[in-house]
């Protein structure tokens, strides 16, 4: 079996970020842990943020994250690129600059040709090279399924950290990539997605969030996260709860893959979407006009999704224009931060 014949999605049970442990299970596993206290740990496990931040000096802090998962596309090289872009995204979401990375690999050596792993690593390495990141090592284990990702370290100024918990009333929320990758990945696995859509989704998933992060650095951004395995509403709920505010989302303005809605109608929805809804659905109020399939889309676990940026309202149009000017064509204002209802997401 070689990398020219294998369909990676047929070799795994889960796909991409949809393979994450259910958020409720993770919450129970972490609840009540006696975490070490360190005054230089600026962002840690006490909040569900995108990366940890540790202060080295008054003007330098380390940003650290790790992300890996099974393949959501069939091509090994593309999978490597997507996994690397997804892992690097956490650093960008915090406002940091990624510097070094280490490979995390699980590989079924008895059933898969080693050329597959070579292609995966080459894809990841090329994406790291594009990001200006140095690969310094890695770790492998033999497993029944292929998994790949990165542990990433970046730099940030301690006073310029972006977290999920600083939403301000009136902020506009901007999304930089379309939703629906979890549903589309399920369709790819089922052999239903055509080549044009598959190529378009791969292009978006391999796109670094670097350009969006660079652009938002010139604006008054109060909070940011990247949309990944807990879905749009799952990650937004974390922001709302941590910030002590509410959010209003306009469903018609949310960028998405139209094909994902068609497959949602067919029930082609990853299990992670149901886990996300079960855990965070209590924070969401849907208007009567929001269809069931669109509700499913908003809980769909994303792989290498876009940034969700909270920006001062008087700068929102300029930020969207600047994002589009860099090639992020789907960037759009999808909602606003409101004072009430407290800790609620209203989708209209």
Curated annotation (Swiss-Prot):
Picking any one GO biological process from the record gives: selenocysteine biosynthetic process
What does the record give as EC number? 2.7.9.3
InterPro entries assigned: PurM-like_C_dom (IPR010918), PurM-like_C_sf (IPR036676), PurM-like_N (IPR016188), PurM-like_N_sf (IPR036921), SelD_I (IPR023061), SPS/SelD (IPR004536)
What the record says about family reads: Belongs to the selenophosphate synthase 1 family. Class I subfamily.
One annotated Gene Ontology cellular component of this protein: cytoplasm
Q: Which cofactor does it need?
A: Mg(2+)
A single MF term (Gene Ontology):
ATP binding
Active site per the UniProt annotation: 17
What HAMAP family does UniProt report for this protein, alphabetically?
Answer: SelD (MF_00625)
From the UniProt record, list the reaction(s) this protein catalyses: hydrogenselenide + ATP + H2O = selenophosphate + AMP + phosphate + 2 H(+)
Report residues binding Mg(2+): 50, 90, 226
Q: Which domain of life is it from?
A: Bacteria
Co-factor binding comment: Binds 1 Mg(2+) ion per monomer.
Site positions for Important for catalytic activity: 20
- Describe its assembly: Homodimer.
Enumerate the residues binding ATP: 20, 47-49, 67, 90, 138-140
Entry protein name:
Selenide, water dikinase
Q: What does this protein do?
A: Synthesizes selenophosphate from selenide and ATP.
Q: Which UniProt keywords apply?
A: ATP-binding, Kinase, Magnesium, Metal-binding, Nucleotide-binding, Selenium, Transferase
